[in-house]
């Protein structure tokens, strides 16, 4: 399977994708470079598919990848983390959709180094 190294070692790349995936689940839209977004898309798609499954094994698989960060409050006023948000809010939204949960929109080049910037968001 082809992938981009993103100028990092494998552990740094995995940490970067974990952070970006967690941020995308929490904020539902982030701005990043085009290459990072293209690498992030299949990771997030798999996480949402696990969220749709919703069983204990899927929860544990997601918990092993997504960071435990606060994702705001739910309807009851309790603080929820990124994993709870994925299973309670994000995955049910895509119950009828078979893949294609993310959208990448180009923003133009970054001012400092000219890297192509994009917004990746949940549909």
Curated annotation (Swiss-Prot):
Protein name, entry field: Large ribosomal subunit protein bL17
GO BP field: translation
Gene label: rplQ
Complexes and interactors: Part of the 50S ribosomal subunit. Contacts protein L32.
InterPro entries xrefs: Ribosomal_bL17, Ribosomal_bL17_CS, Ribosomal_bL17_sf
Alphabetized UniProt keyword annotations: Ribonucleoprotein, Ribosomal protein
Coiled coil: none
A GO MF term: structural constituent of ribosome
Entry GO CC: cytosolic large ribosomal subunit
Pfam family, one: Ribosomal_L17
Family listed: Belongs to the bacterial ribosomal protein bL17 family.
């Amino acid at each position: 399977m082809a992938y981009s190294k993103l100028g990092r070692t494998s552990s740094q790349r995995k940490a970067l994708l974990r952070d970006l995936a967690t941020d995308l689940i929490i904020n539902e839209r982030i701005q990043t470079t085009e290459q990072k977004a293209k690498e992030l898309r299949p990771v997030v798609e798999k996480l949402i598919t696990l969220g749709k499954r919703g069983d204990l094994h899927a929860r544990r698989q997601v918990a092993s990848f997504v960071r435990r960060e606060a994702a705001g409050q739910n309807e009851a006023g309790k603080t929820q983390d990124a994993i709870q948000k994925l299973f309670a809010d994000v995955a049910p939204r895509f119950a009828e959709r078979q893949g294609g949960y993310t959208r990448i929109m180009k923003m133009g080049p970054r001012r400092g180094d000219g890297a192509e910037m994009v917004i990746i968001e949940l549909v």
